[in-house]
């Protein structure tokens, strides 16, 4: 290793791709494998960016962290995709899934142990997807997650499984988590097919070599990533501020209070919440760029999923450069903390488009609600957020420093025309009785458990229903993150946190080796829905045109050819915007009139 310099020895070996010496240095355990160089890269990030496959292989064998994000918010896997090297992507993807599975094996029992220490309860979480666009709001579904918690056992029922091929997927499913001494048991109950899939989560049951081998992705899997844009979407809450909502008219305004599920709640607005979406395409061929740009349906374009393509201004490429070092940066320049690279960088020149949108989230907080956000609700959201993008966004939001109180209702943006509204209700069956939940006499129960709102949950709700077939019980098949069949959809929807690679899948698809969307809806269903949407647009446009004037039909010139679907969608959006502006204008005018009347009445006295 002589001549490589005293600082950043692992990085310098990676720079030169001297992988045998790198192996020896890592075996000595004298160096920090996660140390960052002056540009903020770990040895693994540097090796991937430079395309040094042999060094990447050595670092991954020594358990370098694949989940780390760069200071710019890009994951190691995303940087691997940007190289365009299929072998690099396959290797990084395999180790990423391996490290995720290992973390889940240890993490889920820990979350269940947290639940064990909290009082038992039953609660319902109503998810409503809302939009300010009328046509979209009609297509938005709602779902109620029913949650039972007893000891370290948890059951979550849902009927909304996901969103695939532009249709919402329905089905009655239960996800049951049961803590055990050596780990945890996870069951997915498909009530429609009366089938139960089981998986035992225990590190002792999975040999690392077998687990790693099972994580090897298919060639199609790798190819789909290499022919799709790299997308990072995240909520930026660094500048978020919480303000109390006001109600009343001028001169008599007060802080807003609302009753939610029987609890008085203070209403807050969270301002300066930004949704940042970035898309990279430098790894795509011209054909792939055209396909991804033109492959979006008119409805997807209407929802704002089409991004404008732009390239970053880069330093000129030099003759002595390589594809992964286009500006011929030397090792001395790169590793010198006092040397400024300015616009020069290593790796492929980045082609990136970005969109920043500002939103206002709303919170209804009740200080008298008996549930504990940290002890009872957060572990559940953590369990569901392992693989569900909606829960992941909810988790990121509730981990902020919220004002005091339990969030009985939350409204957060998912992307710029779609919000999610989550309401906690029917706590312990107090609003609507639940057969599996019993609330004892308050006096004796409170003294026994110390909980302000205790309830008893029937243990049979965590058992396999009678007559159901059990598949995969105690199987040795490892966990697998099978989110990639949904990757293209997730990119188009911008409903994922690609910075941490939390794409949208159901819990069981992320915990087991089950492929998502095994039975996708037939294409005719999607086509029929688009026809229905187009028909609705035509009717709404026709009605709006007829209402504009009393022109007789005899004087009407021959009607031109019907507008395209894209044009109809554009017109519908314009009409929706006009109607919204008109409503706001009328509301403002009414408030101004009220203020004038009040001022006049005050001056008369």
Swiss-Prot record:
Interacts with EGFR (ubiquitinated); the interaction is direct and may regulate EGFR internalization. Residues 538-605 are annotated as: Disordered. GO terms for molecular function: ubiquitin-modified protein reader activity. The modification Phosphoserine is found at residue 552. GO terms for biological process: negative regulation of receptor internalization. Ubiquitin-binding protein that specifically recognizes and binds 'Lys-63'-linked ubiquitin. Does not bind 'Lys-48'-linked ubiquitin. Positively regulates the internalization of ligand-activated EGFR by binding to the Ub moiety of ubiquitinated EGFR at the cell membrane. Its main location: membrane. The keyword Transmembrane helix does not apply. Residues 482-501, 528-547, 564-583, 589-605 form the UIM domain. The gene is Ankrd13d. It comes from Mus musculus. This is Ankyrin repeat domain-containing protein 13D. It is found in: Cell membrane; Late endosome.
